[in-house]
UniProtKB/Swiss-Prot annotation:
This protein's name: Plakophilin-1
Signal sequence coordinates: none
SMART domains assigned: ARM
SUPFAM superfamilies: ARM repeat (SSF48371)
Subunit structure: Part of a complex that contains DSG3, PKP1, YAP1 and YWHAG; the complex is required for localization of DSG3 and YAP1 to the cell membrane in keratinocytes. Interacts with DSP. Interacts (via N-terminus) with KRT5/CK5, KRT8/CK8 (via rod domain), KRT15/CK15 and KRT18/CK18 (via rod domain) as part of intermediate filaments. Interacts with VIM (via rod domain). Interacts with DSP. Interacts with DES. Interacts with FXR1; the interaction may facilitate the binding of PKP1 to PKP2, PKP3 and DSP mRNA.
Role summary: A component of desmosome cell-cell junctions which are required for positive regulation of cellular adhesion. Plays a role in desmosome protein expression regulation and localization to the desmosomal plaque, thereby maintaining cell sheet integrity and anchorage of desmosomes to intermediate filaments. Required for localization of DSG3 and YAP1 to the cell membrane in keratinocytes in response to mechanical strain, via the formation of an interaction complex composed of DSG3, YAP1, PKP1 and YWHAG.
C-alpha cells in the first residue's frame, strides 16, 4: 500500500491563484513513482523558478501580497468576540504609584507620561485593488489605493504590557527601512485576504458617476509600507505624486471639493504625525485641526475614517492639539459620529481619539458629559453581554478593539507618583481623568448598566480562563478607581449600620460620643453584625459585593499581568481603607470568607514594585482588625518579614513598601508576640535600625521607629533587642520622642 506524501495544509484563500504558494511541490503521481530524490529536488527547484517568473509577470495587477497586514510578528491570541479577522496585541509596561490623602489608604490607578501607544493597520478595508470597470460604486475603501501604504494610527492607552514585537517602518519614499521601537507596542488587524477582482462587499459610502481610474504615480515606485511586502502604490488621480506630498499641501487637500483629495490629505497627515512629532505643530499652525473636525461630518466613510485617524495621531501626547480639538468642537463631532456610524474601522479611530483626549484634565468634564453615554450605550454595554431584562438597547456587533478603546477612555491615568500613607489613607493625584475625578466617579457609578457591564465582562473572562485579556485590565482599572472613597461618597449598608452602631454606643456611654468607647468603635475593635448582601446587586452595589471580591481574588490567583494584579489589589485596598465598618467587613470577607490571604501574600513575591506596594498596603489595612490577626499571622508574617529582611530599597516604591510592612508587623506582633519572635532575625533588625536612621525615606523611618518602640514595650520581644545590644538609651536616640508621640496619637 502506497501512502500519500505529507504536504503542508494552508487556508484555501491563500491558493485562489494556484501559483500563490511559498513551496512548489511535484504532483502526487510524481511523488509516488520511483524517481530518485535528486530528481525530485531538481523538479521542485524548476517549479519554484517557474512560479516566481509567473508571479513577477503579474506584479502590475496586484497591489499587495495576500497577507494584508501592515505589521508583522505580532500575536497575543486576543480573539474574544472577534469578527472575520484576527486581532493581535502586545503591550508596554507603565509604572504606577500613589499620592497621599489625609484619611484613607487606598489608591487610584495612575500612569506616567511615557504611555504606551499602539498602531494598527486597516489593510482589510483599504488595500483592495479594483481593476478598471470592475464596479460602478464607491465602497468604503474603493476610493483610495495610494493610501493603503501609509495609514497608521496610535493611541495612548495607560496599560501595562510586555513588548513582543518591533515596528518595522519604511520612511515615505524609501525602501523598507527597518527601525526597532522597543518603547512602543503595536496591535494590527490582519485581513488574511489576497487582492480579489470583484466589487467590494461593504455598502457603498457614496455613489460614483464613473469607475475610478488608477494610474501609477510618476515618482511613487518606492515601497511605503511598514514591514509589509513590497507592492506598487496607486492613486485615483492623474497628477498626484505621493513622494512630493507635504504637510501644507495635505492641509490644502482637506479643503478640496473632491472627497478623494480630502482622504489623501487626511491620511498623509495621519501617517506623517505617526512618524514625525514636529508635523503635529505644523498642522496646528496651518489650521488643519479645524478642517479635519469638519471632515468628520462628511457623508463619505473613507473621509470620516481618514479624518478621525489623523486627529487621533495629532492629539497623541500633544496638549495643545487636544485643546484645539476641543475648541473646534472636535469632541462633540467625534461623539456624534460614533453615535451614528456602524463602521467598525471608523469606531476604532473615534474611540482611540477619545482615549487620547481623556488624559487631559481640561477635557474631562466635557468627555464625561458627552462621551460617556455613547461609550456606555453603543460600545461597553452591548459588547459585555450584560442585560437587565428591561432594556430595549440595541445589541449591535461591537469590535473587540472598539471595546478595548472605550474602556481605556474610562480608565484613569495620573501624571504624578501616588504615595501610600503611614496611617490608613487612600491615594489621590493632581492629574486625573474620567473615572478618577470626583465628579467623574459619581457620574460613572450612577450610570445605569455601566458597572454591571464591566463586572459581567470581567467575570465572564475569569470563567473562560481569559484572565490576561487586555480589556480585562482596562475594566479592572475602572473598577479600581470607582472603589476609591466608596464608603464616603456612596450610601451603603455599611454606612447605615455604622450610624446605628454609633447611636447605640452614644446611648450607653455617659461621657458622650467623644469617649474612649467612641474611639474604640471608630477603630473597629468591637463586634457588630455585618449587613446582609443583596442577592442581585446593581450598579455601585457591585463594588463591595462578595461576588466582586471573589472575582478580584480569582484574577489575582490566575492573571500574569502586573497591571491587572495591581488593579485587583488596589480595588481591595480601597475597600479596606476606611476607619469605619466597611473596612472591617471587607477585610473579613477577603481574609475569612473568601480565604484570599494566600493570593495577596504571593503579590509580595512579584518582581514588579507596583504590585508589591499594592499588596503590602492591602495587608497593612487588613492588619488593623484584630479578628484577622490569627489567620494573618501564619499566612502573611513570613512574607512581610521577608520584605523587611531582604528588600533592597532601590525602587521608587521602596519607601511605601517598607513602611506598610513595618505597620503590618507592628499590628500582628501585638497579638502574637511568640509567633513574631520566630521571624525576627538579626538581618531584619539591622534593616529596621538602618531605616530609623535613614533621611531619604522619612515615612519608612517613622514606621520603623514605631515598630522598634513597640518591640521594646513587649516583654516577649524586648529580649530580642537586648540580644542585639540595644538598651533604652540607644533606642530613645533612634526613635526620637517627639515623632513617637505624634505617630502614636495618630493610631
Amino acid at each position: 500500500m502506497n501512502h500519500s506524501p505529507l504536504k503542508t495544509a494552508l487556508a484555501y484563500e491563500c491558493f485562489q491563484d494556484q501559483d500563490n504558494s511559498t513551496l512548489a511541490l511535484p504532483s502526487d503521481q510524481k511523488m509516488k513513482t520511483g524517481t530518485s530524490g535528486r530528481q525530485r529536488v531538481q523538479e521542485q527547484v524548476m517549479m519554484t523558478v517557474k512560479r516566481q517568473k509567473s508571479k513577477s509577470s503579474q506584479s502590475s495587477t496586484l497591489s499587495h501580497s495576500n497577507r494584508g497586514s501592515m505589521y508583522d510578528g505580532l500575536a497575543d491570541n486576543y480573539n474574544y468576540g472577534t469578527t472575520s479577522r484576527s486581532s493581535y496585541y502586545s503591550k508596554f509596561q507603565a509604572g504606577n504609584g500613589s499620592w497621599g490623602y489625609p484619611i484613607y489608604n487606598g489608591t487610584l490607578k495612575r500612569e506616567p507620561d511615557n504611555r504606551r501607544f499602539s498602531s494598527y493597520s486597516q489593510m482589510e478595508n483599504w488595500s483592495r485593488h479594483y481593476p478598471r470597470g470592475s464596479c460602478n460604486t464607491t465602497g468604503a475603501g474603493s476610493d483610495i489605493c495610494f493610501m493603503q501604504k501609509i495609514k497608521a494610527s496610535r493611541s495612548e492607552p495607560d496599560l501595562y504590557c510586555d513588548p513582543r514585537g518591533t515596528l518595522r517602518k519604511g520612511t515615505l519614499g524609501s525602501k523598507g527601512q527597518k527601525t526597532t521601537q522597543n518603547r512602543y507596542s503595536f496591535y494590527s488587524t490582519c485581513s488574511g485576504q489576497k487582492a480579489i477582482k470583484k466589487c467590494p462587499v461593504r455598502p457603498p459610502s457614496c455613489a460614483s458617476k464613473q469607475d475610478p481610474v488608477y494610474i501609477p504615480p510618476i515618482s511613487c515606485n518606492k515601497d511605503l509600507s511598514f514591514g509589509h511586502s513590497r507592492a506598487s502604490s496607486k492613486i485615483c488621480s492623474e497628477d498626484i505624486e505621493c513622494s512630493g506630498l507635504t504637510i501644507p499641501k495635505a492641509v490644502q487637500y482637506l479643503s478640496s471639493q473632491d472627497e478623494k483629495y480630502q482622504a489623501i490629505g487626511a491620511y498623509y497627515i495621519q501617517h506623517t504625525c505617526f512618524q514625525d512629532e514636529s508635523a503635529k505643530q505644523q498642522v496646528y499652525q496651518l489650521g488643519g485641526i479645524c478642517k479635519l473636525v469638519d471632515l468628520l461630518r462628511s457623508p463619505n466613510q473613507n473621509v470620516q475614517q481618514a479624518a478621525a485617524g489623523a486627529l487621533r495621531n495629532l492629539v497623541f501626547r500633544s496638549t495643545t492639539n487636544k485643546l484645539e480639538t476641543r475648541r473646534q468642537n472636535g469632541i462633540r463631532e467625534a461623539v456624534s459620529l460614533l453615535r451614528r456610524t456602524g463602521n467598525a474601522e471608523i469606531q476604532k479611530q473615534l474611540t482611540g481619539l477619545l482615549w487620547n483626549l481623556s488624559s487631559t484634565d481640561e477635557l474631562k468634564e466635557e468627555l464625561i458629559a458627552d462621551a460617556l453615554p455613547v461609550l456606555a450605550d453603543r460600545v461597553i454595554i452591548p459588547f459585555s453581554g450584560w442585560c437587565d431584562g428591561n432594556s430595549n438597547m440595541s445589541r449591535e456587533v461591537v469590535d473587540p478593539e472598539v471595546f478595548f478603546n472605550a474602556t481605556g477612555c474610562l480608565r484613569k491615568r495620573l501624571g504624578m507618583r501616588e504615595l501610600l500613607a503611614l496611617v490608613p489613607q487612600r491615594a489621590t493625584s493632581s492629574r486625573v481623568n474620567l473615572s478618577s475625578a470626583d465628579a467623574g466617579r459619581q457620574t460613572m457609578r450612577n450610570y445605569s448598566g455601566l458597572i454591571d457591564s464591566l463586572m459581567a465582562y470581567v467575570q465572564n473572562c475569569v470563567a473562560a480562563s481569559r484572565c490576561d485579556d487586555k480589556s480585562v485590565e482596562n475594566c479592572m482599572c475602572v473598577l479600581h478607581n470607582l472603589s476609591y472613597r466608596l464608603d464616603a461618597e456612596v450610601p451603603t449598608r455599611y454606612r447605615q449600620l455604622e450610624y446605628n452602631a454609633r447611636n447605640a454606643y452614644t446611648e450607653k456611654s455617659s461621657t458622650g460620643c467623644f469617649s474612649n468607647k467612641s474611639d474604640k468603635m471608630m477603630n473597629n475593635n468591637y463586634d457588630c453584625p455585618l449587613p446582609e448582601e443583596e442577592t442581585n446587586p446593581k450598579g455601585s452595589g457591585w463594588l463591595y459585593h462578595s461576588d466582586a471580591i471573589r472575582t478580584y481574588l480569582n484574577l489575582m490567583g490566575k492573571s500574569k499581568k502586573d497591571a491587572t494584579l495591581e488593579a485587583c489589589a488596589g480595588a481591595l485596598q480601597n475597600l479596606t481603607a476606611s476607619k469605619g465598618l466597611m473596612s472591617s467587613g471587607m477585610s473579613q470577607l477577603i481574609g475569612l470568607k473568601e480565604k484570599g490571604l494566600p493570593q495577596i501574600a504571593r503579590l509580595l513575591q512579584s518582581g514588579n514594585s507596583d504590585v508589591v506596594r499594592s499588596g503590602a498596603s492591602l495587608l497593612s489595612n487588613m492588619s488593623r482588625h484584630p479578628l484577622l490577626h490569627r489567620v494573618m499571622g501564619n499566612q502573611v508574617f513570613p512574607e512581610v518579614t521577608r520584605l523587611l529582611t531582604s528588600h533592597t530599597g532601590n525602587t521608587s516604591n521602596s519607601e511605601d513598601i517598607l513602611s506598610s510592612a513595618c505597620y503590618t508587623v507592628r499590628n500582628l506582633m501585638a497579638s502574637q508576640p511568640q509567633l513574631a519572635k520566630q521571624y525576627f532575625s538579626s538581618s531584619m533588625l539591622n534593616n529596621i535600625i538602618n531605616l530609623c536612621r535613614s533621611s531619604a525615606s522619612p515615612k519608612a523611618a517613622e514606621a520603623a521607629r514605631l515598630l522598634l518602640s513597640d518591640m521594646w514595650s513587649s516583654k516577649e520581644l524586648q529580649g530580642v533587642l537586648r540580644q542585639q545590644g540595644f538598651d533604652r538609651n540607644m533606642l530613645g536616640t533612634l526613635a526620637g520622642a517627639n515623632s513617637l508621640r505624634n505617630f502614636t496619637s495618630r493610631f
